[in-house]
């Protein structure tokens, strides 16, 4: 029997009001709510913790981890302006989506 899996790629930032000075961190996880909570607690990646990347700006769901990892790699190769454009198209107000994700834990 096939088992459904859940994987997410996500972008977190340290600011949601100043795109110019914000840091963007891209990651992949199999439990988005747990990972966002870890970022907020400072136990996420060293880079994200150092720059206080706690605000979730964007995420995508995948069933296959290989697809999620490939997409993560693709986004990491994008220019900063292209990443910002992706966020602006789907989250133009740069609202922190983490509260919604954590609420649905």
Model segments located where?
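GIY-YIG nuclease catalytic motif and its immediate N-terminal context
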Residues: 1-45, 49-61, 66-73, 86, ...
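A common structural junction motif
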Residues: 77-80
């Amino acid at each position: 029997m096939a088992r459904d899996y859940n994987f997410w790629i996500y972008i977190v930032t340290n600011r949601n009001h100043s795109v110019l000075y914000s840091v963007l961190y891209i990651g992949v996880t199999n439990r988005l709510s747990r990972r966002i909570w870890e970022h907020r607690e400072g136990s996420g990646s060293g880079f994200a913790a150092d720059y206080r990347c706690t605000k979730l700006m964007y995420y995508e769901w995948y069933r296959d981890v290989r697809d999620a990892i490939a997409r993560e790699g693709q986004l990491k190769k994008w220019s900063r302006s292209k990443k910002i454009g992706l966020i602006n198209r789907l989250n133009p107000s740069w609202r922190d989506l983490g509260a919604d994700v954590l609420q649905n834990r």
